């Protein structure tokens, strides 16, 4: 009988586990700014959109969380589903003030979550400080979040990042705490 690869693997080598928190959303939604702000507890605006992949580790009192942001422009969206299977949870960032792109964001979000019906989902309705921003109840409706499934943990946060260098708003801290708890629960 031929041994399987698993039998040949070294016992000290850990099996590959889902360990990254994916940060996805259309280009211009504010994913990088949100991620940097979560990491540093300070508002840090990003100017250029992510071209490719951006990984960030955030330490909490109890653990270390690995975030993987994948660019939101069309050439990079094809990678989203490939990495989804390796994710602990999905953070999906939308620009609350960009009304014309919400149907596109909804389409991609629903394609992603259809592939994994139990993957926890955290939606950031970003740029809530802008005058044109939809309220989170409007974002909930525009993204059809009531259709994400009963087996999935889903959370929606209205977020904004104001002055560069200032402390992150309490909503962002609450979101960070929740993400840490969700990640710990899934692992």
Swiss-Prot record:
SUPFAM superfamilies: P-loop containing nucleoside triphosphate hydrolases
UniProt-annotated binding residues for GTP: 25-32, 69-73, 126-129
Pfam (any one): Arf
Alphabetized UniProt keyword annotations: GTP-binding, Nucleotide-binding
One of the record's GO molecular function terms: GTP binding
Classification via Gene3D superfamilies: P-loop containing nucleotide triphosphate hydrolases (3.40.50.300)
Top-level division of the source organism's lineage: Eukaryota
PROSITE patterns xref list: ARF (PS51417)
InterPro entries attached to this UniProt entry: Arf-like_GTPase (IPR053254), P-loop_NTPase (IPR027417), Small_GTP-bd (IPR005225), Small_GTPase_ARF/SAR (IPR006689)
UniProt record similarity statement: Belongs to the small GTPase superfamily. Arf family.
Protein name from the UniProt record: ADP-ribosylation factor-like protein 9
